[in-house]
Amino acid sequence: MEKLTYYQEITFNGKKQKRKKEEVIKMTGKVTKMHSTKNYDVLLENDQEIKAYISGKMSLHNIKLIPGDMVDVEISPFNLTLGRIVFRHK
């Protein structure tokens, strides 16, 4: 489990500044069930099952997932039952 911090670039008085956007928890899991082309059930490495959706870049590049695929999931600390799939392992 690893914590990642995303930064958002904003302009204030003509100067670009970075602002913390969100801290996420990154975990590895296995796709167990496919609800639609974008919604999945993922079993995490700590034996917790969550619902997850495909990130925008994955759907843009038509990356398909099937049950049994190993994936990286980012989870917000505010809602630990919903995640975003950001990478599919080969």
Swiss-Prot record:
Species whose genome carries this gene: Mycoplasma sp
Coiled coil regions, renumbered to chain: none
HAMAP family given in the database record: IF_1
Annotated CDD domains: S1_IF1 (cd04451)
Signal peptide: none
Protein name as annotated: Translation initiation factor IF-1
GO cellular component annotations of the record: cytosol
Location(s), subcellular: Cytoplasm
UniProt cross-references to PROSITE patterns, sorted A to Z: S1_IF1_TYPE (PS50832)
Transmembrane segments: none
Annotated Pfam families: eIF-1a
